[in-house]
Swiss-Prot record:
UniProt-recorded name of the protein: Peptide chain release factor 1
Post-translational modification remark: Methylated by PrmC. Methylation increases the termination efficiency of RF1.
Gene: prfA
Gene Ontology cellular-component terms listed: cytoplasm
Family under the similarity heading: Belongs to the prokaryotic/mitochondrial release factor family.
NCBIfam families per record: prfA, PRK00591.1
Keywords, comma-separated and alphabetical: Cytoplasm, Methylation, Protein biosynthesis
General function of this protein: Peptide chain release factor 1 directs the termination of translation in response to the peptide chain termination codons UAG and UAA.
SMART domains: PCRF (SM00937)
Residue(s) carrying N5-methylglutamine: 235
Pfam (any one): RF-1
GO molecular function: translation release factor activity, codon specific
Amino acid sequence: MKPSMLAKLDQLTERLDELNVLLMQEDATSNMDNYRKMTREHAELGPLVALYGNYRQADSDIQDAQGMLSDPDMKEFAQEEIAAAKTRMEQLEIDLQKMLLPKDPNDDRNIFLEIRAGTGGDEAALFAGDLLRMYSRFAERNRWQIEMVSESASEVGGYKEVIVRIIGFGAYSKLKFESGGHRVQRVPATETQGRIHTSACTVAIMPEADEVEDVNINPADLRIDTYRASGAGGQHINKTDSAVRITHIPTGIVVECQDDRSQHKNKASALKVLAARIKDVQLREQQSKEAATRKSLIGSGDRSERIRTYNFPQGRMTDHRINLTLYKLDFIMDGDLTELTNALAAEHQAELLAALGDAN
């Protein structure tokens, strides 16, 4: 293991010892915010330091076994011990490297999922509806909640644009690599000649900001317009100006929300989406710089990139970033995304490990 990594692990071991002392003090709970912060840090460091203890024990076993090599009766046993300990150390070093990777601070956050129909007209709108169902089913499998924030329905079904809020621990960590262009190849229901059409949608996954204030939105930078909601009709439609459109003048970002009958609730929802979009712009700029350094395709934040193709006649899904093809499209469209999300996370982790190795 590289000296820089050993030094880091020694430092974290000392920090855990320090936390043990601090948490045992009588006045540890006098400041509950600080106490919770320390307990979280303790919980994160515990498994890492335990693993490092196993690594040091394996190193110690090698030293002990090497001392027996000069004894003819113990030489064979010592060689076996050294080989076994070296194998353990190699695996432990890999595990320690993974645990030392910086944690994405947004991983545990709720998200806003935005799907926009692109090229392909009605078929693209229908596919946007299919994608929303796919992600909704995945959310259900993870026992997350889904809230409709904004929708622009298509006349033939599906959506021209739809935004939902997904509430659940780790939602961003599992879906953050879904942003980008999603292409579908299939025969539309209206196609009489049986020809395959190609359509596309753009997906954006945006971590929810803790508070709107976190993103530092200046009220003077906002233009807020109200208008009458449009919808399927009924006694509550078009009676009041309940729909809200917010424009963030510096960035040109526009958010509309009309799904609630209350203008106040629509404004609150629109502000949350606006905060998430501004945070997302900042995050993508950062990801783009980091990805360029790593020459990475995953997590680059590039929405224009076509990341995936769904081919219905062949029953396959291909993720172009990692050259992964799965022939279980029906299951995937029903929300079975675990194999895919795990593969993307593993590849991203491998890129981070490679970058960590270069840095050391």
